[in-house]
UniProtKB/Swiss-Prot annotation:
InterPro entries hit by this protein: Bet_v_I/MLP, MLP-like_ligand-binding, START-like_dom_sf
Family listed: Belongs to the MLP family.
SUPFAM superfamilies reported for this sequence: Bet v1-like
One GO term of the biological process aspect: defense response
Protein name listed in UniProt: MLP-like protein 34
Organism superkingdom: Eukaryota
CDD domains, per the entry: Bet_v1-like
Pfam families the record matches: Bet_v_1 (PF00407)
Amino acid sequence: MAKTEAPSLVGKLETEVEIKASAGQFHHMFAGKPHHVSKASPGNIQSCDLHEGDWGTVGSIVFWNYVHDGEAKVAKERIEAVEPEKNLITFRVIEGDLMKEYKSFLITIQVTPKHGGPGSIVHWHLEYEKISDEVAHPETLLQFCVEVSQEIDEHLLSEEEEVKTTETLETEVEIKASAEKFHHMFAGKPHHVSKATPGNIQSCDLHEGDWGTVGSIVFWNYVHDGEAKVAKERIEAVDPEKNLITFRVIEGDLMKEYKSFVITIQVTPKHGGSGSVVHWHFEYEKINEEVAHPETLLQFAVEVSKEIDEHLLAEE
């Protein structure tokens, strides 16, 4: 009597989703910053936490909170493969809700640029073994992947639009003081800047944290365009080796005209001689087209730089 073959419990499901974002951008959402996926698709994915290792590296463990088939679920996954050239990443589910119905579950996401045009194709590949024949194939999970892909695409495109509306202004000021000394005025003792340039800056107070550390909050009183103004700023970056500091304006007069305003000051020693070059870089988004570009503020930065230079030389 012929043996009836048991139905195979091993299966594969795949689908493709056309997107407008680039292959590199989409891949980076899962490889470089999966903790941002919840921002793009909050109805489907609530969080992704790193449990072991580093984002996007083989062997690392990530933990997802997601909603599938109307239920809150979790998945602990190990990254099995990452191939940046192919925009490919593979996750193996090791714990969580899927393990109640499957002995093994592998998810591979590969993104390929579209031929002869912008955009890309996201290829989802699910490879699994069911614990019994009663378990359904994960077709609703594949549909979930399609929805997540479409929402990530929208998120990436809206981010691009935001980048387009951000503008920059920059200038350089040659000074005689050393790069370290000038940098230290803004990183180590910005409350001394008012001594150097009292007509422009009246005070700088520390509201939170420590001078020159990322996340700290400082509060400036200054005069610009003949008016007394204030600025509350958060320190976004400090790189002593590059003599660089970045401030993000979070409150004050500038916020009346700009949605965002970031100021970076970097000082580099002059090649083959004494002195340095102060590079001021403004990155901003105006609230509307009527708002002027902050050219007078750039001129203010030049004046402040020159007066700080004189102050530092007098101290020597």
